[in-house]
């Protein structure tokens, strides 16, 4: 691993329909093999589906879902004197967002609906209402951190 300099962050343009940077990041995370148009169709289709079902602003619902899934604290392994401890640490804001996006997508992929649009819209609605597997994942991570609070003095 090179120690010369840290890779600079790439500039991400907001998405064309809603003008939102987070939706663009979400789209990029869904994209496979550089097929951005397919990812756009999935994300916009899911947001349109959510708008029809809930009759609310889909962007607000999307942000609420992300906020409900984002972890505030997580555990990292730390080796101290031959023993490995799970040390709870706070999550940086950019990592919080990245984890929330990743967990939402993996939870949507694990659902039983037929198309990815249906799966994603269902998971977004569930996450916005504090239900679903993505929220369960966040609660599991928080529970793990709470259980290992005794090792928080090993923080670095």
UniProtKB/Swiss-Prot annotation:
It comes from the Bacteria. One of its GO terms (cellular component) is small ribosomal subunit. GO terms for biological process: translation. Keywords: Ribonucleoprotein, Ribosomal protein, RNA-binding, rRNA-binding, tRNA-binding. SUPFAM superfamilies: Ribosomal protein S7 (SSF47973). PROSITE patterns: RIBOSOMAL_S7 (PS00052). The keyword Ribonucleoprotein applies. CDD domains: uS7_Bacteria (cd14869). The keyword Transferase does not apply. GO terms for molecular function: rRNA binding; structural constituent of ribosome; tRNA binding. It holds the Pfam family Ribosomal_S7. Part of the 30S ribosomal subunit. Contacts proteins S9 and S11. Belongs to the universal ribosomal protein uS7 family. One of the primary rRNA binding proteins, it binds directly to 16S rRNA where it nucleates assembly of the head domain of the 30S subunit. Is located at the subunit interface close to the decoding center, probably blocks exit of the E-site tRNA. This is Small ribosomal subunit protein uS7. It comes from Bartonella tribocorum (strain CIP 105476 / IBS 506).
């Amino acid at each position: 691993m090179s120690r010369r300099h840290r890779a600079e962050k790439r500039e991400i343009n907001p998405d064309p329909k809603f003008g939102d940077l987070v939706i663009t990041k979400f789209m990029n995370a869904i994209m496979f093999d550089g097929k951005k148009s397919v990812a756009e169709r999935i994300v916009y289709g899911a947001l349109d589906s959510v708008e029809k079902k809930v009759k609310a602003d889909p962007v607000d619902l999307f942000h609420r879902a992300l906020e409900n899934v984002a972890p505030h604290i997580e555990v990292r392994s730390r080796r101290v004197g031959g023993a490995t401890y799970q040390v709870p640490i706070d999550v940086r804001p950019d990592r919080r967002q990245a984890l929330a996006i990743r967990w939402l997508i993996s939870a949507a992929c694990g659902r039983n609906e037929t198309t990815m649009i249906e799966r994603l819209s269902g998971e977004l609605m569930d996450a916005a209402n504090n239900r679903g597997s993505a929220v369960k994942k966040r609660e599991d991570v928080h529970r793990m951190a709470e259980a290992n609070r005794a090792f928080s003095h090993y923080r670095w």
